[in-house]
Amino acid sequence: MNDQKDNKEIQTIVPLNQKTNLNELDAKAIYDEFQKLNKYQRAFAWLKLPKQKKAELKQFLNKKKTQVDLLKEDFNHANVFEIRNFNFWYMNRTKHVLHDLNLDIKRNKVTAFIGPSGCGKSTFLRNLNQLNDLIEGTSHEGEIYFLGTNTRSKKISSLELRTRIGMVFQKPTPFEMSIFDNVAYGPRNNGINDRKILEKIVEKSLKSAALWDEVKDDLDKAGNALSGGQQQRLCIARAIALEPEVLLMDEPTSALDPIATAKIEELILELKKKYSIIIVTHSMAQAQRISDETVFFYQGWIEEAGETKTIFIHPKNKRTKDYISGKIG
């Protein structure tokens, strides 16, 4: 399909203008429209559907015993990730850095990874979206399930996985382009080229990242001309422009001042209403402030995992208690 036809089909499904009245479309009609799109546009359109229409479509799919091709997601899966006996090596298996990890990560929660430097928490984070696969000499054993599907199966490509799992790094990494183009970059790569649709995506993403009011009159300004805190929120907006299921954050506030850090933390608490968020942090105070669940890593092992209040107030593991109290680091 050409771009003009693609955009017309998407507008049939997504309520992007007043001419579209989704209330008049039944589940079968929506399903039929989905089949006209490529897989990336299908995923985008699905994520923009109102909850009521999603529910109707699920009912229809259950009756037909089939699913829209959206990574074959289990719609009722309680955990966003399930890790089973996972091991990871660098340097052609000469450096064993993650050992027999088993962990369930819940949906729509903030999960904090804590532990001393070099304990494996960032390495593990980058295995969730297969970024470590880009490093020569790495290998792994065990399984990582994303919404019930093994991420190493042929059902999910690395590209599809990274579309559904956004990433925000320690240092803000805006592209050398305008604010608008930074946020529109992912949707464009996934086949969304209509200017009006992109404008709506950019506005919504910047609003979700609490940045719109600060930059709405300067969207042509270079992204790297923003302040450090604004750049990090721009990177968050860019990550959520594709409506991912998960946001991975690798020490997202470590390079920011206290005021910018507070804004990011406030934003995370708002974003968890829609996304599952996993954050690596060296700040135990930050983990206590914003996370629902905490995982303590030590020398490549998971020492303890559970509700944040329990981990910090009544840890079961002596090593966890020693780390939290500052006896080890």
Swiss-Prot record:
It comes from the Bacteria. It is found in: Cell membrane. GO terms for molecular function: ATP binding; ATP hydrolysis activity; ATPase-coupled phosphate ion transmembrane transporter activity. Its EC number is 7.3.2.1. It is an enzyme of class 7 (translocase). SUPFAM superfamilies: P-loop containing nucleoside triphosphate hydrolases. InterPro entries: AAA+_ATPase, ABC_transporter-like_ATP-bd, ABC_transporter-like_CS, P-loop_NTPase, PstB-like. This is Phosphate import ATP-binding protein PstB. The gene is pstB.
